[in-house]
Amino acid sequence: MKMKKYTKTHEWVSIEDKVATVGITNHAQEQLGDVVYVDLPEVGREVKKGEVVASIESVKAAADVYAPLSGKIVEVNEKLDTEPELINKDPEGEGWLFKMEISDEGELEDLLDEQAYQEFCAQE
């Protein structure tokens, strides 16, 4: 079963089996503006929840991307090397950043559902 969750640091997480696909939310890309460069994590890297795993540079700012869960990076979106603008065009689809194998499914409970995330954004 596939489920989509969000973090307070503006990452989205689509979970299927024990693999999570991660990207930044539409709200985050709107704040950043036009993305010009993405620094992605290495495949095989073990990451802990909350650790900086990637960074995104735009014409306005640079932003860190945090691991929403603990686990191992199993794939990165190599299209972003030549087409970083995919993050602006389709942040929650073609503009995904990386996939990770989840090591602690208990951490899923800390993630927000879509309604809770929208409410969080409205309060910022």
From Swiss-Prot:
InterPro entries: 2-oxoA_DH_lipoyl-BS (IPR003016), Biotin_lipoyl (IPR000089), GCV_H (IPR002930), GCV_H/Fam206 (IPR033753), GCV_H_sub (IPR017453), Single_hybrid_motif (IPR011053). The glycine cleavage system catalyzes the degradation of glycine. The H protein shuttles the methylamine group of glycine from the P protein to the T protein. The glycine cleavage system is composed of four proteins: P, T, L and H. Residues 19-101 form the Lipoyl-binding domain. PANTHER family: GLYCINE CLEAVAGE SYSTEM H PROTEIN (PTHR11715), GLYCINE CLEAVAGE SYSTEM H PROTEIN-RELATED (PTHR11715:SF3). One of its GO terms (cellular component) is cytosol. It comes from the Bacteria. Belongs to the GcvH family. The modification N6-lipoyllysine is found at K60. Signal peptide: none annotated. Gene3D superfamilies: 2.40.50.100. It holds the Pfam family GCV_H. One of its GO terms (biological process) is glycine decarboxylation via glycine cleavage system. This is Glycine cleavage system H protein. PROSITE patterns: BIOTINYL_LIPOYL, LIPOYL. The keyword Ribonucleoprotein does not apply. Binds 1 lipoyl cofactor covalently. Keywords: Lipoyl.
